[in-house]
């Protein structure tokens, strides 16, 4: 579920830049419909990937539970049986407290790797957004310093609303 949420956030960040561009009304309506279908497809793909990483589709997990119950491996009396400490798992979902095995360690490594991938993707998306808004902060500061040195701007603060083109009122 964590990975699915991260994928949804990634798609939202990546789609935020095109949504902020001004366009005509008819084009906007057509684009919104196209973007909605694209976002729907992306979310479905993200959910498929998320369920794959989290142990398969719900029907597959239910079939696995039924097989465990039929084989006598699982005492399926309830999903909140905290007292059991044998090797079998009662419930493989989010209420599985305190149990760790090799599979959990592998999943944590996958999450860390996926998290670093999302971190890099987020940095790239922020860089694209900064470039669309006028460059990186350091670049904007350098541009402001150049304008101040050339006498084009009296740089007294970033909220100087009263002046137009460097003239005093």
Curated annotation (Swiss-Prot):
GO terms for cellular component: axon; extracellular space. GO terms for molecular function: neuropeptide hormone activity. The modification Sulfotyrosine is found at residues 76, 91, 155. Expressed by the skin glands. Residues 135-169 are annotated as: Disordered. InterPro entries: CCK-like (IPR015499), Gastrin/CCK (IPR001651), Gastrin/cholecystokinin_CS (IPR013152). Residues 27-72, 86-87, 101-151, 165-169 form a propeptide. Its main location: secreted. Residues 1-26 form the signal peptide. The modification Phenylalanine amide is found at residues 82, 97, 161. Pfam families: Gastrin. Keywords: Amidation, Amphibian defense peptide, Cleavage on pair of basic residues, Repeat, Secreted, Signal, Sulfation. PROSITE patterns: GASTRIN (PS00259). The pharmacological activities of caerulein are quite similar to the physiological activities of gastrin and related peptides. Belongs to the gastrin/cholecystokinin family. This is Preprocaerulein type-3.
